[in-house]
Design a protein with these regions (language model features):
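A conserved ligand/cofactor-binding region detector
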Residues: 1-179
Length: 179
């Protein structure tokens, strides 16, 4: 790279890492999608399109604090689709929007990672650090990958997130089967 006037550090920083989580299960899922693409098999992944994904830790006034990590930019691999689904919860319905990321395998084979987002998400509800009203599901469902679930509101939000993803994914599969 150096012989061609390129710097590996600059290349590594050129594109932000999708802040979709890099824990064991997320990494394993990514490897599976890549492997199935490489083998030429059909198999797409489903997840949630978190606006802030993980969070960053910074020092302010000699204190460690957490701040949102806005990984989504206009220069993203994420492709907005026209696909939407209504997700019905008790007492409310929210609209999901599907975004796609191509997962490229060896020899140009590929599959897709379908990420669902809530159309009514509101990034402005994030307060000090990464705090937000966890009970306003219509505005917060896809804000953070790991919302604080140390209280009932956080645990209920996680259940809403899981239900939202499963419902949107199931509707997508049923729609494909009907074609």
């Amino acid at each position: 790279l150096a012989q061609n006037g390129k710097n590996i550090c600059e290349i590594e920083e050129f594109e932000k890492e999708p802040s979709l989580g890099n824990g064991g299960l997320g990494r394993l899922a990514a490897c599976f999608i890549d492997s199935i693409a490489t083998l030429g098999l059909n198999g797409d992944g489903v997840g949630l399109n978190y606006h802030f994904g993980l969070f960053r830790q910074v020092f302010e006034n000699n204190m460690q604090t957490t701040v949102p990590d806005p990984w989504l930019t206009e220069k993203s691999w994420l492709t907005k689709t026209d696909v939407t689904y209504d997700i019905k919860f008790k007492g409310m319905t929210v609209k999901s929007r599907m975004y796609d990321i191509d997962v490229i395998g060896y020899n140009n084979t590929s599959n897709k990672l379908h990420l669902f987002d809530i159309e009514s998400v509101d990034e402005s509800i994030v307060e000090d650090g990464i705090n937000f009203n966890k009970e306003d599901i219509k505005k917060n469902l896809t804000l953070f990958l790991y919302p604080d679930d140390s209280d009932d509101a956080g645990r209920i939000l996680r259940i809403y997130q899981q239900y939202f993803m499963v419902s949107a994914g199931a509707q997508m599969i049923l729609e494909e089967c009907e074609k």
